Amino acid sequence: MSRTPPSRWNRLDRWMVSFMAAYGIKLLRISVAIIFIWFGALKVIGRSPVYELISRTVYWVSPEFFVPFLGVWEIVVGVGLLCRLALRLTLLLFWLQLAGTFLVLLLRPDIAFQFGNPLLLTTEGEFVIKNLVLIASGLVIGSTVERT
Protein backbone atom coordinates (compact mmCIF):
# COMPACT_ATOMS: atom_id res chain seq x y z
CA MET A 1 0.00 0.00 0.00
CA SER A 2 1.50 3.30 -1.04
CA ARG A 3 1.44 6.25 1.26
CA THR A 4 -0.20 9.40 -0.06
CA PRO A 5 1.88 12.55 0.13
CA PRO A 6 0.89 15.00 2.85
CA SER A 7 -1.59 17.60 1.78
CA ARG A 8 -0.68 21.26 1.68
CA TRP A 9 -2.75 21.74 4.80
CA ASN A 10 -0.79 19.06 6.67
CA ARG A 11 2.53 20.51 5.52
CA LEU A 12 1.43 23.99 6.62
CA ASP A 13 0.25 22.58 9.94
CA ARG A 14 3.58 20.81 10.54
CA TRP A 15 5.48 23.97 9.62
CA MET A 16 3.37 26.09 11.98
CA VAL A 17 3.80 23.66 14.88
CA SER A 18 7.54 23.51 14.20
CA PHE A 19 7.75 27.32 14.10
CA MET A 20 5.84 27.67 17.37
CA ALA A 21 8.04 25.05 19.05
CA ALA A 22 11.20 26.78 17.83
CA TYR A 23 10.27 30.39 18.58
CA GLY A 24 7.26 30.45 20.93
CA ILE A 25 9.05 30.60 24.27
CA LYS A 26 11.62 33.11 23.03
CA LEU A 27 8.88 35.38 21.66
CA LEU A 28 6.91 34.97 24.90
CA ARG A 29 9.97 36.04 26.92
CA ILE A 30 10.57 39.04 24.65
CA SER A 31 6.88 40.03 24.79
CA VAL A 32 6.79 39.90 28.59
CA ALA A 33 10.06 41.88 28.68
CA ILE A 34 8.53 44.60 26.49
CA ILE A 35 5.47 44.80 28.75
CA PHE A 36 7.62 45.17 31.87
CA ILE A 37 9.93 47.77 30.32
CA TRP A 38 7.02 49.77 28.88
CA PHE A 39 4.86 49.73 32.01
CA GLY A 40 7.91 50.41 34.18
CA ALA A 41 8.95 53.39 32.08
CA LEU A 42 5.46 54.88 32.38
CA LYS A 43 5.76 54.66 36.16
CA VAL A 44 9.22 56.27 36.16
CA ILE A 45 8.10 59.25 34.06
CA GLY A 46 4.90 59.70 36.08
CA ARG A 47 2.50 58.77 33.27
CA SER A 48 1.25 55.38 34.46
CA PRO A 49 -2.52 54.88 34.30
CA VAL A 50 -2.28 52.76 37.46
CA TYR A 51 -0.64 55.45 39.61
CA GLU A 52 -3.82 56.01 41.63
CA LEU A 53 -4.47 52.28 41.97
CA ILE A 54 -0.97 51.74 43.34
CA SER A 55 -1.17 54.71 45.69
CA ARG A 56 -4.56 53.55 47.05
CA THR A 57 -3.34 49.97 47.49
CA VAL A 58 0.14 50.54 48.94
CA TYR A 59 -1.10 53.47 51.02
CA TRP A 60 1.58 53.12 53.72
CA VAL A 61 4.38 54.20 51.33
CA SER A 62 4.61 57.58 49.62
CA PRO A 63 3.47 57.14 46.00
CA GLU A 64 5.99 59.79 44.90
CA PHE A 65 8.70 57.33 45.99
CA PHE A 66 7.03 53.96 45.49
CA VAL A 67 5.58 54.27 41.99
CA PRO A 68 8.90 55.28 40.34
CA PHE A 69 10.71 52.65 42.47
CA LEU A 70 8.28 50.02 41.20
CA GLY A 71 8.85 51.33 37.68
CA VAL A 72 12.61 50.87 37.97
CA TRP A 73 12.00 47.39 39.40
CA GLU A 74 9.84 46.52 36.38
CA ILE A 75 12.43 47.89 33.95
CA VAL A 76 15.10 45.74 35.62
CA VAL A 77 12.84 42.69 35.24
CA GLY A 78 12.16 43.56 31.61
CA VAL A 79 15.83 44.05 30.72
CA GLY A 80 16.72 40.84 32.55
CA LEU A 81 14.12 38.92 30.56
CA LEU A 82 15.05 40.56 27.29
CA CYS A 83 18.78 39.87 27.65
CA ARG A 84 18.48 36.67 29.73
CA LEU A 85 20.63 38.34 32.40
CA ALA A 86 20.74 36.57 35.76
CA LEU A 87 17.51 34.87 34.77
CA ARG A 88 16.95 33.21 38.15
CA LEU A 89 17.26 36.56 39.95
CA THR A 90 15.17 38.24 37.26
CA LEU A 91 12.43 35.66 37.76
CA LEU A 92 12.56 36.16 41.53
CA LEU A 93 11.99 39.90 41.01
CA PHE A 94 9.26 39.02 38.48
CA TRP A 95 7.44 36.80 41.01
CA LEU A 96 7.71 39.37 43.80
CA GLN A 97 6.30 42.09 41.54
CA LEU A 98 3.41 39.90 40.40
CA ALA A 99 2.59 38.88 43.96
CA GLY A 100 2.37 42.58 44.77
CA THR A 101 -0.16 43.19 42.02
CA PHE A 102 -2.63 40.93 43.79
CA LEU A 103 -2.49 43.01 46.98
CA VAL A 104 -5.40 45.09 45.74
CA LEU A 105 -7.65 42.02 45.84
CA LEU A 106 -6.81 41.46 49.50
CA LEU A 107 -6.29 44.97 50.84
CA ARG A 108 -8.77 46.94 48.74
CA PRO A 109 -11.50 44.63 47.46
CA ASP A 110 -13.70 47.73 47.19
CA ILE A 111 -11.46 48.84 44.32
CA ALA A 112 -11.32 45.44 42.58
CA PHE A 113 -14.90 44.20 42.85
CA GLN A 114 -18.29 45.73 42.14
CA PHE A 115 -20.67 45.65 45.12
CA GLY A 116 -18.23 43.38 46.99
CA ASN A 117 -18.96 40.53 44.58
CA PRO A 118 -15.72 38.76 43.53
CA LEU A 119 -17.34 37.68 40.27
CA LEU A 120 -18.05 41.28 39.25
CA LEU A 121 -14.68 42.84 38.50
CA THR A 122 -14.09 46.54 38.13
CA THR A 123 -11.68 47.83 35.49
CA GLU A 124 -8.97 47.73 38.13
CA GLY A 125 -9.93 44.18 39.07
CA GLU A 126 -9.69 43.08 35.45
CA PHE A 127 -6.27 44.74 35.23
CA VAL A 128 -5.11 42.62 38.17
CA ILE A 129 -6.74 39.33 37.14
CA LYS A 130 -5.16 39.47 33.68
CA ASN A 131 -1.86 38.99 35.48
CA LEU A 132 -2.76 35.30 35.65
CA VAL A 133 -1.52 35.21 32.05
CA LEU A 134 1.78 36.75 33.17
CA ILE A 135 2.04 34.12 35.91
CA ALA A 136 1.62 31.35 33.34
CA SER A 137 4.17 33.10 31.12
CA GLY A 138 6.63 33.22 34.01
CA LEU A 139 6.21 29.49 34.55
CA VAL A 140 6.97 28.80 30.89
CA ILE A 141 9.95 31.17 30.84
CA GLY A 142 11.22 29.74 34.12
CA SER A 143 11.15 26.26 32.64
CA THR A 144 13.95 27.34 30.29
CA VAL A 145 16.45 28.11 33.05
CA GLU A 146 19.18 25.50 32.84
CA ARG A 147 20.15 23.71 36.02
CA THR A 148 23.65 24.53 37.21
Predicted regions mapped to residue ranges:
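Membrane-interface extramembranous regions
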Residues: 1-148
